Structure formats: C-alpha cells, structure tokens
Amino acid sequence: MSRYRGPRVRIIRRLGTLPGLTNRSAPQLKPSSINQSTSNKKISQYRIRLEEKQKLRFHYGITERQLLNYVRIARKAKGSTGEILLQLLEMRLDNIIFRLGMTPTIPGARQLVNHRHILVNGYIVDIPSYRCKPQDFITIKNKQKSESIISKNIEFYQKSKIANHLTYSSLEKKGLVNQILDRESIGLKINELLVVEYYSRQA
C-alpha cells in the first residue's frame, strides 16, 4: 500500500488528532451508538486494532509494508515490542526534524530531506527513514531560503516544549539527539499493544 496523499482532514475526522500528519485538530463528533451483538463485538475489536495501526501509519507517514517491517524488527529485539516499535518510528530522521520544530508536519520534514537540505553530523542525508542515533546532530545546508523557512517554523512551532530526548540550539541552528526516547515522550496518543496484536499473525 502506497503512502497516503489525499485529504488530511478526512483522516483525522476518522482517527483523531495526528500532529505528524497535520497541525489541525480533529473535529468533535457525536459518539456513535454501540451494537451489543456478539458478532459486532468481534468486528469492533478488529476495528479498534485496525484504527490504532492506521494512526501510526498516517501520523508517521509510512506505507503498510514499512510499518510491517518495523514490527518485525521490533519483535526480534529484546524488550517490549510495542515500545521498541515506537522508538524505531520516533528515531526516523523525518520525525526528528518534526519533533525539533523545524517543520510543522512530518510530510514537510520529508520534503526537506528529499530536497537535500538536511545534514546529519555534517553530511547530507536524503533518506527520510534514516535511523538517528544518540549524539547525532541535525543541521541545514547553508541556503538562505531554507534557513529562513526553518527559522520561522522554529519560532512558531517550538512554543510547546521539545521532548527530553532532543535539544535545539537557535544560535547554532542545530538539533541534537540526546538519547533514545522513553514511552512518555511519544508525541502521539496511541495504544501500541493493539498495533502489535493486529500484526500478530503477519510479523
């Protein structure tokens, strides 16, 4: 399944607020009535897991195949599969740029990376899925236009506190990955265990 490029409001209306996809809040909807039949209960449980999976896909802007690969990697690692899955997604370069406040959304961050505006440890990296590590520092190429855009984004989107695993120097225009983030620093309301359950027969 390819990356979604359709209307973003339609997605957040169905799944709720997804800050990585759009900075718009989900519209308030009236709670739907719940059917108490046994068959519908089974369907609803599947739907809940499906929607949690879709939240991850759309928030981080990844394909179904990419998400499945991340789940498989997380399953092979030691520790909580769900937490490791979130760490893998959060340490993607496009997400780090977004969490630093350099762009308003993850698609915006991906565009900067694809256009070769981003350097990691002084080297151009044009792969949005690049996995950042502790002590990596993120800078932008010395181009007046990109610096101007990012400076405006920083000023506006860093009103909320940056997560503890990251720091940003406005003077040097440099972001730093301090450490692997903990569960409390995830920038999305998500039940990752339901995502792991969804993929239990595939990963």
Curated annotation (Swiss-Prot):
Give the UniProt subcellular location, in the record's own words: Plastid, Chloroplast
Q: Which GO terms describe its molecular function?
A: rRNA binding; structural constituent of ribosome
One biological process term in Gene Ontology: ribosomal small subunit biogenesis
Provide the Gene Ontology terms for cellular component.
chloroplast; small ribosomal subunit
Which SMART domains does its entry note? Answer: Ribosomal_S4, S4
The cross-references to PROSITE patterns, in alphabetical order and at most eight, read: RIBOSOMAL_S4, S4
Give UniProt keywords alphabetically. Chloroplast, Plastid, Ribonucleoprotein, Ribosomal protein, RNA-binding, rRNA-binding
All copies of domain S4 RNA-binding, residue ranges: 91-159
Major subcellular site: plastid
Pfam families linked: Ribosomal_S4, S4
Q: What does this protein do?
A: One of the primary rRNA binding proteins, it binds directly to 16S rRNA where it nucleates assembly of the body of the 30S subunit.
Q: Describe the family membership recorded for this protein in Swiss-Prot or TrEMBL.
A: Belongs to the universal ribosomal protein uS4 family.
Binding partners and assembly: Part of the 30S ribosomal subunit. Contacts protein S5. The interaction surface between S4 and S5 is involved in control of translational fidelity.
Q: What is this protein called?
A: Small ribosomal subunit protein uS4c
What gene is behind this protein?
rps4
